[in-house]
């Protein structure tokens, strides 16, 4: 499990890319709503109770189409940010 100190350092790095989504992702990760399945696959329980599948290589299957994309085309929604924080990336 990632410590809150380590998460805060990671969050500082994520905010320029994902903005408020990084903060919401930190809330999800800190509240234990992120679960590792296998390999690059994770499940994240969203704020409304829906469960989203996040693939570290391909992104999240949620409908947040306005989330910013990185150089690889991965959308940085709050669920993806939560997984990045939980995984210590």
Where would I find each of the regions flagged by the language model?
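Long, low-complexity, compositionally biased intrinsically disordered regions
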Residues: 1-89
């Amino acid at each position: 499990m990632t410590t809150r100190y380590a998460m805060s350092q990671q969050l500082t790095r994520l905010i320029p890319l994902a903005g408020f989504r990084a903060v919401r992702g930190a809330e999800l990760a800190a509240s234990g709503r992120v679960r590792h399945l296998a390999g690059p696959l994770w499940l994240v329980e969203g704020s409304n109770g829906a469960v989203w599948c996040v693939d570290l290589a391909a992104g999240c299957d949620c409908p947040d189409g306005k989330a910013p994309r990185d150089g690889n085309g991965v959308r940085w929604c709050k669920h993806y940010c939560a997984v990045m924080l939980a995984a210590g990336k």
